[in-house]
């Protein structure tokens, strides 16, 4: 029906996400994927959860809300000011960040049409960092690309 969705979850998903904590009736964000010929209005969100974070603070900011999330170093290394991060599947712009936390603005539309309207301090959220950042790190890291690599590193 229009209000239900079923999916299988593999152990990797349960290890990296908060989905194992959900109970029947809990709300989740579910969006249709963008078509290749469609408009990309945010960043590429694959739906692969990289890890979890915690809602640390929520403060009003005009009609919007500033929401601060704490996250582990493995996530924070890819979070930059004015960059993108997916929180519970929603592509959001980072307002600011430091070594262990980042803040986003939740506009009224997002608050009313996603799970953010019911989020509170202490809630565990799913985080997905920008895939481009992970690829760039991999490409510029000082490792041996191995035989058959398209690009070799000059020494």
Report residues per predicted region.
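Conserved loop->alpha-helix
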Residues: 1-155
């Amino acid at each position: 029906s229009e209000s239900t969705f079923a999916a299988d979850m593999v152990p990797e998903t349960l290890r990296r996400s908060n989905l194992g904590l959900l109970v029947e009736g809990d709300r989740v964000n579910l969006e249709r994927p963008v078509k290749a010929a469609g408009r990309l209005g945010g960043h590429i969100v694959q739906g692969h959860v990289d890890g979890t974070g915690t809602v640390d603070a929520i403060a009003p900011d005009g009609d919007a809300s500033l929401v601060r999330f704490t996250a582990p170093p493995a996530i924070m290394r890819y979070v930059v000011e004015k960059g993108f991060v997916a929180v519970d599947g929603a592509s959001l712009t980072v307002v600011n960040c430091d070594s262990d936390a980042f803040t986003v603005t939740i506009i009224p539309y997002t608050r009313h049409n996603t799970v953010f309207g019911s989020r509170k301090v202490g809630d565990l959220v799913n985080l997905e960092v920008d895939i481009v950042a992970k690829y760039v790190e991999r490409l510029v890291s000082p490792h041996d690309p191995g035989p058959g690599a398209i690009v070799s590193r000059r020494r």
